[in-house]
């Protein structure tokens, strides 16, 4: 039951663009995890740049830097 939570700066993506990105992400999990399409979910959460550190970096990224599969190229 993989769930992908994409947190990002505002991009003004259309619903069609979100659907395409979600389908692409789901395809990767289906390929590498063997997941079925019905078991996958994808969320898009826009975070304002000035809120990124408080809402994403400090509570989610920073505490897990040692275990992240892909680390960011920035820090605060």
Swiss-Prot record:
HAMAP family: Tautomerase_PptA (MF_00718). Pfam families: Tautomerase (PF01361). One of its GO terms (molecular function) is intramolecular oxidoreductase activity, interconverting keto- and enol-groups. Signal peptide: none annotated. It comes from Pectobacterium atrosepticum (strain SCRI 1043 / ATCC BAA-672) (Erwinia carotovora subsp. atroseptica). Its main location: cytoplasm. GO terms for cellular component: cytoplasm. It is found in: Cytoplasm. The gene is pptA. The lineage of its organism: Bacteria, Pseudomonadati, Pseudomonadota, Gammaproteobacteria, Enterobacterales. Homodimer. Belongs to the 4-oxalocrotonate tautomerase family. PptA subfamily. Keywords: Cytoplasm, Isomerase. This is Tautomerase PptA. NCBIfam families: PRK01271.1. It comes from the Bacteria. The active site is at residue 2. Its EC number is 5.3.2.-. The keyword Cytoplasm applies.
